[in-house]
From Swiss-Prot:
This is Semaphorin-3B. PANTHER family: SEMAPHORIN, SEMAPHORIN-3B. The gene is SEMA3B. It comes from Homo sapiens. Keywords: Disulfide bond, Endoplasmic reticulum, Glycoprotein, Immunoglobulin domain, Secreted, Signal. Residues 733-743 have a biased composition (Basic and acidic residues).
Amino acid sequence: MGRAGAAAVIPGLALLWAVGLGSAAPSPPRLRLSFQELQAWHGLQTFSLERTCCYQALLVDEERGRLFVGAENHVASLNLDNISKRAKKLAWPAPVEWREECNWAGKDIGTECMNFVKLLHAYNRTHLLACGTGAFHPTCAFVEVGHRAEEPVLRLDPGRIEDGKGKSPYDPRHRAASVLVGEELYSGVAADLMGRDFTIFRSLGQRPSLRTEPHDSRWLNEPKFVKVFWIPESENPDDDKIYFFFRETAVEAAPALGRLSVSRVGQICRNDVGGQRSLVNKWTTFLKARLVCSVPGVEGDTHFDQLQDVFLLSSRDHRTPLLYAVFSTSSSIFQGSAVCVYSMNDVRRAFLGPFAHKEGPMHQWVSYQGRVPYPRPGMCPSKTFGTFSSTKDFPDDVIQFARNHPLMYNSVLPTGGRPLFLQVGANYTFTQIAADRVAAADGHYDVLFIGTDVGTVLKVISVPKGSRPSAEGLLLEELHVFEDSAAVTSMQISSKRHQLYVASRSAVAQIALHRCAAHGRVCTECCLARDPYCAWDGVACTRFQPSAKRRFRRQDVRNGDPSTLCSGDSSRPALLEHKVFGVEGSSAFLECEPRSLQARVEWTFQRAGVTAHTQVLAEERTERTARGLLLRRLRRRDSGVYLCAAVEQGFTQPLRRLSLHVLSATQAERLARAEEAAPAAPPGPKLWYRDFLQLVEPGGGGSANSLRMCRPQPALQSLPLESRRKGRNRRTHAPEPRAERGPRSATHW
């Protein structure tokens, strides 16, 4: 079946290579912010209702300034600027008799027999279309939201409640995928209570209701619908198509490989009205193709088969948007997630290619070599591509061919032939994606926000890779937006307000698209961040405004090289030298933690009286940690100046300058006895050895920011580091009470 076709049949050849890829460490973010940090310093807002879960449907209304949320038994209307203020809620529970029927059918009365709102669409200027599971009795209603933003309204229209079959799923565990075009709703759902009859369904509007052929695995084979989009094909609205993204069990897989899940993109024509004698009230223009997201390897491709979400990023030409999709693996051996990018031209090219064909049960899937009837199956009836005005006018051989050949032979491959961004061996899986196109000083960049199943959002930027047209994804931030680490179930973005709205089972969160101040206080840190939202303005790292005519806007997203942009910058303060003291034979910890998790830390050492700097190498007595340098069994010759520097993007940035003074045990004891004997003194200048005495005295409260150390303890020298650290904190008896006294002047010494 060719490269793409073979991939469709055997998606898991490269097991050995996949295991090797799986052993690789996941890419770290440049900046990691906890829930507490986001809430305290970066404006994270959250919203939740009491005794309510499952916030799955999000709808951004920029005109009214509202975020509409569908949840268990509720629809909520939130303020787009701050979702925790001016919230309105509408209770919409399932009727008692429906809940009882649901319970009698064997469903859980507390977790399944509720009305889980799955769909929210803007129906007209005053109403929303909302659909929910209705305790396994799908139902839809029109919700009045008013005309103006100044007076938000949220009211259920009791006279416009209708059956939701074919619009909303029965089961709350099933995802809802739909799009409202005009007054027509296109949905991918299970149309029966048992969840076996999956269909692509059109309802509402003036055109007849249509569905896919039921119980035909060639059309749909246990699909899981993900997203639906309406994308124009030309200036003629008769050519408009609806694209469905889903995953299903592959019918083209070899029986020896078992049940294999693949990702698909399907298409239907919006003006399809079904066939005249065959495929009556069924789609006559339905086609599907495999959506491939894989990493090429020597032994074969490693596939990410589980499509999780798709985001359509509009371009100047509304016919050619970019499609950003997130995938995960289905293998229990190799686990990872990936982002692949697709162009609509490649999708259309696959649907204009050869059809997949199989002669019989014992035959292989091949490219169809016979005559394809006219008009070509999958083409819309319009004046653009033919003379047919309706699908009911299509010849019988066209309808019959469309019924038997819904699958295309060629797959849709990602731009660049490989994922834009992937994470292997991470403790999370990608679940959702949203994208924003940002104008920067050196061009336009796509910024991706990727939700995970552990309540985090990854901020990734797509940057050009060398001179080739392909791009690579750089992980800028990891944001913990949910305190309970609940999986991200939905995301919506407001480019106008620069806000991201994230939903989970437990809450809805709101976070800004940028946190420029978090990147650093100096020019180099701001430029190294490569955040297209941010630039150095000569004083601080602030929001970049493309229209601002400011002279000192420094930004380099493509290369992240501050050597030129920040060469004349005087914002970085002089690197002060901090005195640190240690006792011979004990341990000392020199703390130095770079702001960026992607930076490599280098330590150099300058011995007293020597001008040359030598690199501190890893050996038995030295251990590098994420927070600094640990020196064990200190010697007098360890005294000197230690310089900590961060290396990132080939740029070296000094961070700390620490002067270590190693004292003998005799000197330490003498200083301690002098401290005991010296009388109290009025407040005055603090001596250089006060910090040292606070460190060596038991319970002295030494600062962790400069040094962690202990007196020599021979009995503990052979123990592991953690044991020695615990030993320093143990006490076998209560400390003797000591009188409080203030610092003394140097005259007592």
